[in-house]
Amino acid sequence: MATQTAEESSRARPKKTGLGGLLKPLNSEYGKVAPGWGTTPLMGLAMALFAVFLSIILEIYNSSVLLDGISMN
């Protein structure tokens, strides 16, 4: 018969794909935490630089920074 019960279909193994095989190593370290601070200082530096970038963009948008030789309408 071509029909399956719910029990039989729940036992089916997931289909393996090429993309899944490539991504599996990325998920193998799930839940593990490296000891120490790791790359936290680098992330803090990146966040600080991004905050500076955003503040510069905001100041230019608000025309609170005088730009020599550039006329803004």
Swiss-Prot record:
Name of protein: Photosystem II reaction center protein H
Subunit-structure text: PSII is composed of 1 copy each of membrane proteins PsbA, PsbB, PsbC, PsbD, PsbE, PsbF, PsbH, PsbI, PsbJ, PsbK, PsbL, PsbM, PsbT, PsbX, PsbY, PsbZ, Psb30/Ycf12, at least 3 peripheral proteins of the oxygen-evolving complex and a large number of cofactors. It forms dimeric complexes.
Annotated region described as Disordered, given as residue ranges: 1-20
GO molecular function, one term: phosphate ion binding
Compartments (UniProt record): Plastid, Chloroplast thylakoid membrane
Entry GO terms, CC: chloroplast thylakoid membrane; photosystem II
PTM sites of type Phosphothreonine: T3, T5
Family annotation (SUPFAM superfamilies): Photosystem II 10 kDa phosphoprotein PsbH (SSF161025)
Keyword annotations of the record: Chloroplast, Membrane, Phosphoprotein, Photosynthesis, Photosystem II, Plastid, Thylakoid, Transmembrane, Transmembrane helix
Purpose: One of the components of the core complex of photosystem II (PSII), required for its stability and/or assembly. PSII is a light-driven water:plastoquinone oxidoreductase that uses light energy to abstract electrons from H(2)O, generating O(2) and a proton gradient subsequently used for ATP formation. It consists of a core antenna complex that captures photons, and an electron transfer chain that converts photonic excitation into a charge separation.
Phylogenetic placement of the source organism: Eukaryota, Viridiplantae, Streptophyta, Embryophyta, Tracheophyta
Top-rank lineage group of the source organism: Eukaryota
Main localisation: plastid
Pfam family, one: PsbH
Matching NCBIfam families: PRK02624.1 (NF002728)
Xref: InterPro entries: PSII_PsbH, PSII_PsbH_sf
Modified how: Phosphorylation is a light-dependent reaction catalyzed by a membrane-bound kinase; phosphorylation occurs on Thr residue(s) in the N-terminus of the protein.
GO BP term, example: protein stabilization
Similarity comment text for this entry: Belongs to the PsbH family.
Its membrane topology: Single-pass membrane protein
Cited PANTHER family: PHOTOSYSTEM II REACTION CENTER PROTEIN H
Transmembrane feature ranges: 41-61
